[in-house]
Amino acid sequence: TVVHPHMPDFLALYPEVDVQMRLEDRYMDLIDDPVDLAIRITNHPPPGLMGRHLMDIDHLLCASPQYLARHGTPVHPLELKAHSCIYLGEEPGDAHWKLRSHGKTVTVAVRGRYAANHTGVRLDAVLQHIGIASLPRFTAREALADGRIVQVLPDWSFLPNYSGQLWILHPPTRHLPLKLRVLMDFLAERLGGVDGLQVQRG
């Protein structure tokens, strides 16, 4: 996850604060469920909740240098048809990749022998030279920086079916506990959020 890599530092900075993290695919009801904070990807935070914008989520296509050396580097989206593409695999539309460049959008029906709905699994598949994957930039950042993977079609913007902004949300309250405020501030600083940005919907 995008949050977990930063938690050891948070726990070291605030030894008096305990954290229980729950990874759920289902929608968490912050009013009825016993949850203090939720982190969601959305462009529209739900009405009635308060939240803080942490970061924008963008995606890119990546492959290992070894895979590209063996199979060639695509220079146009349509060339992805000839490659092993690692996609989300939850819905039929996940195998149709959309890319945009200079106002032109191209949709490509891709295929591959491996699909995974977890970004960490797709990254590992790329590192194992299985193919070209769509990855959030925050997932790919470290491997890109050290050269283990490279961006494919860098002149094209990948348009995922699921995108948005990363928000940390909590139920409306006049007095947010200090331990929650420090966690929100910490994550906003680490993930590039705008300091002090608080919104209330509804």
Regions found by a protein language model. Name each.
Residues 19-23, 108-118:
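Short beta-strand-to-loop elements that line the ligand-binding cleft
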Residues 1-50, 200:
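Central regulatory/effector-binding core of bacterial HTH transcription factors
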Residues 141-142, 146, 155-202:
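C-terminal effector-binding regulatory domain of bacterial HTH transcription factors
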Residues 84-103:
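Secondary-structure junction motif
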Residues 125-149:
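A ligand-binding cleft/hinge motif common to bilobed small-molecule-binding domains
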Residues 48-59, 63-88:
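Flexible hinge/capping segments at coil-to-helix
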Residues 46-51, 143-154:
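Ligand-binding "clamshell"
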Residues 25, 41-43, 64-65, 135-138, ...:
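Beta->alpha turn/N-cap motifs
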